[in-house]
Amino acid sequence: MQMKTLGVSELNNYIKNVIDNDFILKNSKIKGEISNFKIHISGHIYFSLKDKNSKINCIMFRSYARGLKFIPENGDNVILKGRVSVYQKDGAYQFYCEDIEKEGVGDLFIAFEALKKKLYNEGLFDEYNKKEIPRFAKKIGVITSPTGAAVKDIINVSKRRNKGVELLIYPALVQGENAPKDLINGINYFSNRDDIDTIIIARGGGSIEELWAFNNEDLAYAIYNCNKPVISGVGHETDFTICDFVSDRRAPTPSAAAEIGVFNLNEVNTNIENYKNRLYNLIRNTINLKFKELNSLENAIKINSPMNTIANEYIRIDNLKNKLCHKIESKIEYEKIKLSKANSLLNAHNPLNILSRGFSIIKDEKNNVITTKEKIEENTCINITLKDGSTKVRISDVYK
């Protein structure tokens, strides 16, 4: 098989896609010593992170740099949280930093990464195992501290979005040695209630030690095996816990978790009104269209109606009758003229008319017309027809 030849840009783009889609590299923590630290005029931070044998170039964009709790310096031993990607123009990979904390929690970081890898390999983070968050939840179970800022944020957001959604608060410790047990009990409690639609597990931001209860392995299994969909709203946007990975939906803050879990009644009412208007317009347009079709059918029926055909035939018959009558009258008149001419001609040649002018018709006893005197003999009888009658005479003498 012939090997495909790649352009430099194609190769860099391919490597970038591979790295960007790697589960570990797209959400990682690394530790080392800061060097070449520089804050750019744009607000972005550029530096290197090194250990005894290696170093990697790092960048922290201004949006993340604003959230730093301290300004790092060259020589600081720190833990970076972020992702690895490739700057395509140079073909160089670098670490895109989202948070910086001073080293001292190295053991916790190692334990976090080990547990994350274990649960990932067991399939607890797989997307196809995650349950869908109900769009119109009526009752939501909230597991958090009853006195913290998180519960206040969740209640305020819920009231603003939909006062009809009921929140059931399960009071739990959210940090400390006994916190995981409380959180697990809360998950199990709401999991077994038929009236609960969604569960929110939440707390405000804090250090890795303060959020460590949400990295508990037993809590991860409890969330994974929960009968209800779970929304994790732990810490701030840059904080990630095992709870975030295993939950059905991760929210960057407790307020955002409430935004996801509680549907906005005003938006729903607006959507319903829009759907009503769309449905009304659709029905109205359909009715108008059907009326047009009906009118077209009525016109077609009128055009093709048998009554129209019959009426047209009556008109045609009347026209034919008038033509026939006209032809008959013309024929009669023509025949009258011919008859008159024939009568005139007949009258002109009628022997009786000739007799009126003094002529007569002479026939012998056998009724033969006598036209010459040679046919007349003495002492015979002849018939003479005159204008007003006929007479029989005897011939006494014939003049030769």
From Swiss-Prot:
Keywords (A to Z) from UniProt: Cytoplasm, Exonuclease, Hydrolase, Nuclease
GO terms, biological process: DNA catabolic process
Keyword Hydrolase annotated: yes
Top enzyme category: hydrolase
GO molecular function, one term: nucleic acid binding
GO cellular component: cytoplasm; exodeoxyribonuclease VII complex
Protein EC: 3.1.11.6
Keyword Nuclease among record annotations: yes
Reactions accelerated catalytically: Exonucleolytic cleavage in either 5'- to 3'- or 3'- to 5'-direction to yield nucleoside 5'-phosphates
Compartments reported by the entry: Cytoplasm
Short name of any one Pfam family annotated for the protein: tRNA_anti_2
Chief localisation class: cytoplasm
Record function comment: Bidirectionally degrades single-stranded DNA into large acid-insoluble oligonucleotides, which are then degraded further into small acid-soluble oligonucleotides.
Subunit structure: Heterooligomer composed of large and small subunits.
Family membership noted in the UniProt record: Belongs to the XseA family.
Record-given protein name: Exodeoxyribonuclease 7 large subunit
Species this chain originates from: Clostridium novyi (strain NT)
